[in-house]
């Protein structure tokens, strides 16, 4: 793998991880408000 491919893979994985983290955080906030 070239450096560019590795960087692209890390970037895409990072975006997915950040998006998942934000989704979980929002669900926790909404759940706390409902209770």
From Swiss-Prot:
GO cellular component: cytochrome b6f complex; plasma membrane-derived thylakoid membrane
Topology in membrane: Single-pass membrane protein
Subunit structure: The 4 large subunits of the cytochrome b6-f complex are cytochrome b6, subunit IV (17 kDa polypeptide, PetD), cytochrome f and the Rieske protein, while the 4 small subunits are PetG, PetL, PetM and PetN. The complex functions as a dimer.
GO biological process: photosynthesis
GO terms of molecular function: electron transfer activity
TM stretches of this protein: 6-26
UniProt keyword annotations, A-Z: Electron transport, Membrane, Photosynthesis, Thylakoid, Transmembrane, Transmembrane helix, Transport
Keyword Acetylation set for record: no
Protein species of origin: Mastigocladus laminosus
Family that this chain belongs to: Belongs to the PetM family.
Matches recorded under Pfam families: PetM
Keyword Heme attached: no
Coiled coil ranges: none
Protein name: Cytochrome b6-f complex subunit 7
Top-level taxon of origin: Bacteria
Protein function: Component of the cytochrome b6-f complex, which mediates electron transfer between photosystem II (PSII) and photosystem I (PSI), cyclic electron flow around PSI, and state transitions.
């Amino acid at each position: 793998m070239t450096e560019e491919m590795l960087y692209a893979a890390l970037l895409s994985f990072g975006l997915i991880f950040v998006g998942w983290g934000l989704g979980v955080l929002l669900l926790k906030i909404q759940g706390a408000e409902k209770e």
